[in-house]
Design a protein with these regions (language model features):
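Hydrophobic alpha-helical targeting segments used for export or membrane insertion
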Residues: 17-21
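Disulfide-bonded cysteine-rich modules in secreted/extracellular proteins
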Residues: 35-45, 66-76
Length: 455
């Protein structure tokens, strides 16, 4: 007799015995049968070991609840009017409901805005939509990530949102060591049983902003200041540059300066250098909105990865491109709460609403909104792919053949700049003893944590 047949036979015997004990007396008296309550238990083999399926999951089955003889306070049997022992069903322990708390790990300061500002918008939405408590630690170095996770876990967090691609590898390692914690990691990388990674096609809206920059420049020289550690930084810069070339073609002249987001002095030097080169429009891709404010102080037109451009540079902004993290993070965290978490390494685009565009400033050149909306709509409908050849790099080498389009996976791996980038400069400096996080836990929100409606 096979093991499975024996198990099935044993389970059936238990069910029949319980049924006889509980309902047959009622049947003899002509009364309706009593419904036997059931409980879910693991199936075991003859030695008492749990039986698993092909996926390694324990096989479960339903069996009747056990009956227990009722006794009084002194332990004496309780009998009915006929002198028969009274029985009752066993009580099952109430299933404990997990209380979730979400902790965010920032590589910069929340007050810096830009990417961190977009995550703060999402953090606020998580509270509004799911009613969950959230908190964060900020200015966390890559080497401090494990300690930041431990700090948040000690504070009750069992969902950790890693807010920088710099942490991708660290989040993956922590996920393997923390089976009681879920990780949601910004920066498309590996997934795991308790790890989801996500990103987006920010180069799409950067491409539209490139067209806007070309329409608004008078000097025909456009600057870019970027942090080398930003998500898909070459893809975003190249997407912007290709947008410039849509209007300016061979005349496109773009200058790129690198600076770290946590150094105001580097940012100022990089922006000043771009202005000295004749750039009258500057695009910023950093983890801080300081370049936007500095450009406004210098009375230079500016575009950046900030959702709140009208607030921080009302007279100087042209537009902005930014991540809308709210919908995805709320959906993923809801799936964790509802116990149907399914990590898939999500990447959102314009069509999904993951990447968005700031409404164009009324002070922009006439026609900016119209010409850019046409390109935006084409991209949103899937009719215009940003990285379609022929595309050459700064050395004149063909990187994308004519008529061919790069896949999202290949765009993520770009480590070159397009031919319209005429000059680059680096203002980054190595710091021997960088100042990291003090691991203070915060939960307060800034005044502005609502992203603008889609234009």
């Amino acid at each position: 007799m096979s093991g499975w047949f024996k198990k099935a036979k044993n389970i059936f015997a238990v069910m029949m015995t319980a049924a006889c004990l509980l309902v047959l007396p009622g049947c003899q008296n002509g009364e309706p049968e009593e419904e036997v309550p059931m409980k879910t238990v693991p199936v075991t083999d003859e030695e008492g070991n749990p039986v698993t399926d092909d996926k390694g999951e324990t096989v479960m089955t339903e069996v009747p609840l056990e009956t227990i003889a009722v006794t009084d306070e002194e332990g004496n049997p309780v009998t009915d009017e006929n002198g028969e022992q009274v029985y009752e069903y066993e009580e099952l322990p109430e299933e404990e409901k997990t209380v979730y708390k979400v902790g965010f790990v920032y590589s910069g300061y929340v007050a810096d805005g830009a990417t961190n500002g977009a995550f703060e918008v999402a953090r606020a939405q998580i509270g509004r939509s799911l009613g969950l408590e959230t908190c964060y630690v900020e200015n966390v170095l890559v080497s401090q990530f494990p300690e930041a996770v431990s700090t948040l876990k000690d504070d009750g967090c069992n969902i950790i949102v890693s807010c920088s691609p710099k942490y991708a590898s660290s989040a993956f390692r922590e996920n393997k060591n923390s089976t009681d914690t879920y990780f949601i990691s910004f920066g498309v990388a590996e997934t795991g049983a308790h790890l989801d990674s996500f990103g987006g096609e920010l180069y799409q809206t950067a491409n539209v902003c490139g067209l806007a920059a070309a329409h608004n420049t008078k000097s025909n020289t456009i600057g870019v200041i970027a942090d080398p550690g930003e998500y898909n930084v070459y893809g975003v810069i190249d997407g912007f540059a290709l947008g410039v070339a849509e209007l300016m073609s061979a005349k496109a002249d773009i200058r790129v300066n690198w600076a770290w987001s946590n150094s105001k002095s580097e940012i100022e030097e990089a922006v000043d250098d771009l202005i000295a080169q004749g750039c009258d429009v500057i695009m910023s891709y950093m983890e801080t909105d300081y370049p936007v404010r500095y450009c406004a102080d210098k009375n230079v037109k500016v575009i950046a990865n900030c959702y709140n451009m009208p607030e921080i540079a009302p007279d100087n902004y042209i537009s902005g491109y930014f991540f809308n993290f709210s919908t995805h993070l709320v959906d993923v965290i809801r799936s964790i709460v509802n116990d149907n978490f399914n990590p898939d390494g999500y990447s959102g685009d314009v069509a999904s609403g993951m990447v968005r565009l700031v409404n164009f400033n009324e002070n922009s050149e006439k026609g900016t909104g119209d010409i850019c909306k046409t390109l935006y709509d084409y991209i949103k409908a899937g009719n215009a792919k940003v990285f379609t050849g022929e595309i050459k790099d700064t050395d004149g080498q063909v990187m994308v053949e004519k008529g061919q389009s790069m896949t999202f996976e290949n765009i993520q791996k770009i480590n070159w700049l397009v031919q319209s980038v005429r000059k680059t400069g680096s203002f980054t400096e190595i710091t021997d003893n960088p100042v990291g996080s003090d691991f203070s836990i915060h939960s307060e929100f800034a005044d502005s944590t609502t992203a603008p409606a889609e234009n």
